[in-house]
Design a protein with these regions (language model features):
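Positively charged interface segments
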Residues: 40, 75-76
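Short, small/acidic-rich helices and loops at N termini and domain boundaries
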Residues: 1-4, 46-74
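Structured, non-catalytic alpha/beta "coupling" segments that mediate domain-domain communication
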Residues: 82-132
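Phosphate-interacting basic helix/loop segments used at nucleotide- and nucleic-acid interfaces
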Residues: 14-33, 155-161
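P-loop NTPase catalytic core of nucleic-acid-dependent motor ATPases
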Residues: 34-57, 110-178
């Protein structure tokens, strides 16, 4: 469950019968699943990927999934007509509520993303604030082509400097070096 919303219901009076609406109610709080930057959506945590996403469509799909799950769990308990107010349905007005929530009601609350290299074999958690993962692992291996290229292009001393700089980036020390 996303920590910045709760699924709510309300009853609307119709001419002939009551309609139960299921909708997302956005909570004003410092969220660990949602980031707001510059007065707008910045990123959302996607648990299945183990990464943050800066694509707002991912946020809308996660909210819609929560709505659908709630409906599926509770559908036997409702009497009358049930209407789920999905984010994808512009006529429901929920997308406008979402934009109002992100742009007007919430204050900036974010961490910079992708300040650390994440390799394919890296364990990632939410606090790594990563939205991208490299497609290859960081592990020892043969680098014959790299060695040949570097020894052709650079002297041993220059190569050492370049590899030192690359190493400082990979280990994260480059942020502390002046």
């Amino acid at each position: 469950m996303l920590d910045f919303l709760m699924i709510s219901t309300r009853t609307k009076q119709s001419k002939k019968k009551d309609i139960i609406e299921i909708y997302p109610k956005f909570i004003i709080k410092k969220s660990s699943d949602l980031m707001i930057r510059g007065g707008d959506f910045y990123a959302i945590w996607i648990e299945e990927r183990g990464l943050w996403s800066t694509d707002e469509q991912d946020a809308l799909q996660l909210i819609d999934r929560e709505l659908k799950n709630y409906y599926e769990e509770k559908k036997g308990t409702f009497e009358g007509t049930v209407r789920v107010l999905y984010m994808w349905d512009a006529e429901s007005g929920m997308i406008d509520s979402w934009h109002k929530y992100c742009q007007k009601q919430m204050r900036d609350s974010f961490h910079m993303l992708d300040e650390k290299l994440i390799f394919s074999n890296s364990k990632v958690n939410k606090r790594d604030y990563a939205s991208k993962r490299l497609s290859y692992p960081l592990e020892p291996g043969e680098t014959q082509a790299y060695d040949k290229l570097m020894s052709t292009l650079y002297s041993e001393e220059e190569r050492h400097k370049i590899e030192w700089a690359i190493g400082s980036i990979v280990t994260g020390d480059s942020k502390k070096i002046q």
